[in-house]
Swiss-Prot record:
Annotated protein name in UniProt: Viral transcription factor IE2
Domain of life: Viruses
Coiled-coil region list: none
Alphabetical GO biological process terms: DNA-templated viral transcription; regulation of DNA-templated transcription; symbiont-mediated perturbation of host cell cycle G0/G1 transition checkpoint; symbiont-mediated perturbation of host cell cycle G1/S transition checkpoint
Organism, scientific name: Human cytomegalovirus (strain Towne)
Amino acid sequence: MESSAKRKMDPDNPDEGPSSKVPRPETPVTKATTFLQTMLRKEVNSQLSLGDPLFPELAEESLKTFERVTEDCNENPEKDVLAELGDILAQAVNHAGIDSSSTGPTLTTHSCSVSSAPLNKPTPTSVAVTNTPLPGASATPELSPRKKPRKTTRPFKVIIKPPVPPAPIMLPLIKQEDIKPEPDFTIQYRNKIIDTAGCIVISDSEEEQGEEVETRGATASSPSTGSGTPRVTSPTHPLSQMNHPPLPDPLGRPDEDSSSSSSSCSSASDSESESEEMKCSSGGGASVTSSHHGRGGFGGAASSSLLSCGHQSSGGASTGPRKKKSKRISELDNEKVRNIMKDKNTPFCTPNVQTRRGRVKIDEVSRMFRNTNRSLEYKNLPFTIPSMHQVLDEAIKACKTMQVNNKGIQIIYTRNHEVKSEVDAVRCRLGTMCNLALSTPFLMEHTMPVTHPPEVAQRTADACNEGVKAAWSLKELHTHQLCPRSSDYRNMIIHAATPVDLLGALNLCLPLMQKFPKQVMVRIFSTNQGGFMLPIYETAAKAYAVGQFEQPTETPPEDLDTLSLAIEAAIQDLRNKSQ
């Protein structure tokens, strides 16, 4: 059983024995390996000592060189191994792990050559065996082509090293200045080449398809090294395939005409001055060569896109991030009648009057309606302000009818900073109340005043007396060719669903009128029976009217207190009578 379990001898691989317990047969290669290790053991010990007292010193006579061993091969007991020194010795060197690149004379045989080139894997030194002997190769020191060692009596040095891995290929260091961008990394803005290494394009919209900035095939100029601005790495994809928003104007000018009363060209007087003739600059946007696909213009997408550029080498002023204006949602200033008339190419006449500071007379009122972006500015409200008692009395009369759907509160105030702060605080409190419809502050636009002649007034009165058909057929349209003007005071309306909410809103608004008697005005206005701003308030309005005729389901706390006092008084009277 044991003999069948043992491994058999492999004739192709004699180094492998039949079993780990059975000694392996000696082959010429193993004999040569044992001989080399025995010969080098003393050399290794002598190399380790190096004068160290811990290691015993070996006499030089006991050491033999390889040349001397070959000369005394007849006296050596291993002469049968040296006779076959050719191929066997080369294989023994490989098995012993000897590196031929070590110091000392190189072992060169007649029938073998050792190669120490690095391989892909860390394997021992490969041996290339050749059948033809190398010319001029000899193992004796006299015929060796290399230089003789200084001490021939000393044995040659053989250092056993592990295989050396292949050295990495060292590439030359490339400077950052030597890296040039591709030719299509260039943007032209106002006839200037912008270096894209200092630009970051950020977009959060998917509607910017077709908005591209044309790129030129020129090499981008590198920014100056002394500017102190960091370089930003350009994106990997070319800029010609990216969508860009319009570049902002370096002067920060708006894209469209601004007719807001809070514009920069404002005055502190109640009427106009000579400087009002100048129009506010409505400068156009940046001039960028663009290619349009599908939509026209840069303002086609309703999104916010930012273009943040670093300082350029030309020294141009940089602007901060700016929102791109939407085309679908326009600002309130663009909804003014004056701007709409300009868009429709309506011609405006310029009155032949002199503009000056001061109050406007009735016969010179036409100079107020010249073509300008200025608003009519007022420190105080230009009309008669009713008293608080009149406003409150009219509100109470409306509340007695139990329906206030045809009533509303109008607040008019100037744009003084202190007044605006107080009004905003009241608006914040109104927003927390129930059953209210609040408007945002808005402006009023005014047209040219005209006094109608008596015949026009007579025709209108007759049409009203005749009835609805005559009034419908009346055609009295009196026009003008002057530019409408807007006043700078703000307006706001409040619509309440029930009398409870109307009186509650008045309690918040009337203190403003009391604090600013010339800058804030509160009115009660009437409308037709059109209903509420939204139908959701109809249930609350009907419940208020019905609730006045229903009996309360619970006894008020005042009645309970009165009843308890009466019971206590009756009990006290009974006690007094019993005594």
